[in-house]
Amino acid sequence: MGQSTLIRAKVGDRFSIGDGCPLTLFGGPCVIEGEDFSLKMAESIAKVCDRLGVQFVFKSSFDKANRTSIGSFRGYGLEEGLRILERVKTELGLPVLTDIHESQQAATVAEVVDILQIPAFLCRQTDLLLAAAATGRTVNVKKAQFLAPWDMKNVVNKLRQGGAENLLLTERGSCFGYNALVVDFRSLPLMRELGCPVVFDATHSVQIPGGAGDRSSGQREFVPVLARAAAAVGIDALFMEIHENPDQALSDGPNMIRLADLEATLRHILRVREAVAEPIGASA
């Protein structure tokens, strides 16, 4: 990647993420928990981001297809979930992001959302990647917990061959034995060398997969620590799942941050990012 080439991804016609752009937050509850709650959370997070000059994309899932237990809450489903996301988008004027799990979902979801997200477990699924690319929407791919950062070049190549122009790559931790994740921060500059802005998923990186037996656990107290470390290394966007009361959340509560803690967390991250203020790269 030539030094004169700007690394950016567009979020529709709203703003860009990458070189020379403000920090972007992908944030919201893990799963859609209702219409009023989604609107309330989106509006509250947006106000924090506006105060801090952070670009904001609302994130929430219509279906959690890979829950640990068959009895766990999965979501409102495709039709109702998209209707709620569309309300967030139109009534609050916010870009929205959600994940897809099957190739046939891509075109339908792309009619509503600004960013299609590919879950980490599915990031090598060629048909899913090509379907997402064919929509013309920006695509955010989470690096699988079992993949090396340099292996993401094959994922990027699939998407580009499929016609995708605006790509983002997300680090969300790597397997560290059983029921544990660890973050190798080298992955951020290494993935950015593929020509894509990079995102750090601070909340899933503290997840303890299957740590509570029939569900995953997590250590939300380490979210700010890892997020500041990522900001020091260099990131274009930050992914954090946020809830008014994480202990009552219907999915991933142990690793979501409290809405009340969001502003202070972002302020610390912005200070670190400003202090570093140099290009991201493995050779920097």
Swiss-Prot record:
GO molecular function: 3-deoxy-8-phosphooctulonate synthase activity
Annotated SUPFAM superfamilies: Aldolase (SSF51569)
Protein name (Swiss-Prot/TrEMBL): 2-dehydro-3-deoxyphosphooctonate aldolase
Location of this chain's protein in the cell: Cytoplasm
Pfam families noted in UniProt: DAHP_synth_1
Catalyzed reactions per annotation: D-arabinose 5-phosphate + phosphoenolpyruvate + H2O = 3-deoxy-alpha-D-manno-2-octulosonate-8-phosphate + phosphate
Family recorded in the similarity comment: Belongs to the KdsA family.
Superkingdom to which the source organism belongs: Bacteria
Group of enzyme by EC: transferase
UniProt-listed Enzyme Commission number(s): 2.5.1.55
One GO process term, biological-process aspect: keto-3-deoxy-D-manno-octulosonic acid biosynthetic process
Annotated metabolic or biological route of this protein: Carbohydrate biosynthesis; 3-deoxy-D-manno-octulosonate biosynthesis; 3-deoxy-D-manno-octulosonate from D-ribulose 5-phosphate: step 2/3; Bacterial outer membrane biogenesis; lipopolysaccharide biosynthesis
Name of encoding gene: kdsA
GO cellular component, one term: cytoplasm
Organism: Synechococcus sp. (strain ATCC 27144 / PCC 6301 / SAUG 1402/1)
